[in-house]
């Protein structure tokens, strides 16, 4: 039995240089009433762009948002008024769509904003809207830290 010596293979290594996104520096500017979200105040827009440019990133965000919503809000064992509100918390979409929009913002930005509209007498929430996180900025703290 004459065996040939085994040839050693060189490792096949490929280096991939991935684009790195520099995290924004949040700055208070005494001339403005809000905290800038990065140097050009555009970090939320950059996050949106990245989610659109990368199919994988967008799919991960969609999956996280859809997993958070699950089968939606159950209408079982609810009063007629509760079901009416769940079916239309505002004139444009139902509660499941509202939660999906919030879950998407939570996955992408780390937070979400709800905008409740009170009834004329102020006794109940008449409408509930999702507000686009990318359009909001934090206000500058006052002397009391609020």
Model-based region annotation:
Residues 1-144:
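Flexible, gly/proline-biased loop segments at the beginnings
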């Amino acid at each position: 039995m004459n065996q040939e010596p085994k040839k050693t293979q060189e490792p096949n290594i490929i280096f991939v240089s991935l684009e790195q996104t520099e995290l924004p520096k949040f700055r208070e500017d005494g001339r403005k009433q809000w905290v800038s979200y990065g140097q050009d105040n555009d970090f939320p827009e950059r996050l949106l762009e990245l989610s659109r440019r990368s199919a994988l990133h967008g799919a991960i965000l969609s999956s996280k948002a859809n997993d958070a919503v699950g089968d939606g809000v159950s209408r079982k064992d609810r009063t007629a008024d509760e079901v009416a509100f769940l079916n239309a918390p505002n004139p444009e979409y139902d509660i499941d769509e509202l939660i999906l929009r919030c879950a998407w913002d939570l996955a992408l930005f780390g937070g979400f904003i709800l905008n409740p509209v009170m009834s004329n007498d102020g006794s109940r929430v008449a409408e509930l809207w999702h507000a686009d996180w990318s359009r909001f900025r934090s206000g500058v703290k006052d002397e009391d830290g609020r």
